[in-house]
Amino acid sequence: MDAAEVEFLAEKELVTIIPNFSLDKIYLIGGDLGPFNPGLPVEVPLWLAINLKQRQKCRLLPPEWMDVEKLEKMRDHERKEETFTPMPSPYYMELTKLLLNHASDNIPKADEIRTLVKDMWDTRIAKLRVSADSFVRQQEAHAKLDNLTLMEINTSGTFLTQALNHMYKLRTNLQPLESTQSQDF
């Protein structure tokens, strides 16, 4: 799975918009959306929110966790813990990127939020590298990676898979070969 596919999955996450138009319910395969009334908040998938925002049909409300104070606490907690801490959304990085690229005018302190999320991302990727290094040095057979997001796994997945394959090959080459010759005299 590549980054574009992960972003596609993230676009299905629900966000809140405040429409400036009236429309009855929309019946889609993924579920019903609406009704849309001017000034009344409604939850829609991110892909629709971005589309409506681009056509100036709504205002996007940032997710509850997309707040400078909350993100600072999460960043500090992530830095203090040795293990990966739960993220506010399984798609926190993709949501931040998409919302800030398409609706930064609707998000207070957008630049600070971008920096805080990038700090959390960098901290988590650094932890992942340290974990992978420790994993290789200890010659472990399996690892437990709780609280990683799909994008984080995707970012390091190729490297980890290749590293594990190389380790497997090295281990099988180092094991003593079993004798195939008979010991009969």
Swiss-Prot record:
> What main location does UniProt list?
nucleus
User: Which family, according to UniProt?
Assistant: Belongs to the GINS2/PSF2 family.
Which positions does the record annotate as the modified residue Phosphothreonine? T180
Protein name, per record: DNA replication complex GINS protein PSF2
Which top-rank group of organisms is this from? Eukaryota
Function, please?
Answer: Required for correct functioning of the GINS complex, a complex that plays an essential role in the initiation of DNA replication, and progression of DNA replication forks. GINS complex is a core component of CDC45-MCM-GINS (CMG) helicase, the molecular machine that unwinds template DNA during replication, and around which the replisome is built.
Positions carrying N-acetylmethionine are M1
**Keyword Nucleus applies:** yes
Q: Which GO terms describe its biological process?
A: DNA replication; double-strand break repair via break-induced replication
Q: Where do we see the Glycyl lysine isopeptide (Lys-Gly) (interchain with G-Cter in SUMO2) cross-link in this protein?
A: K109
Name a Pfam family for this protein. Answer: Sld5
**What are the entry keywords?**
Acetylation, Chromosome, DNA replication, Isopeptide bond, Nucleus, Phosphoprotein, Ubl conjugation
Q: Subunit structure, briefly?
A: Component of the GINS complex which is a heterotetramer of GINS1, GINS2, GINS3 and GINS4. Forms a stable subcomplex with GINS3. GINS complex interacts with DNA primase in vitro. Component of the CMG helicase complex, a hexameric ring of related MCM2-7 subunits stabilized by CDC45 and the tetrameric GINS complex.
Its GO CC terms? Answer: CMG complex; GINS complex; nucleoplasm; nucleus
Does the record's keyword annotation contain Acetylation?
A: yes
| Localisation | Nucleus; Chromosome
Q: Which InterPro entries match?
A: GINS_A (IPR021151), GINS_bundle-like_dom_sf (IPR036224), GINS_Psf2 (IPR007257), PSF2_N (IPR056784)
Residues bearing Phosphoserine are S182
Tell me which species this is from. Answer: Homo sapiens
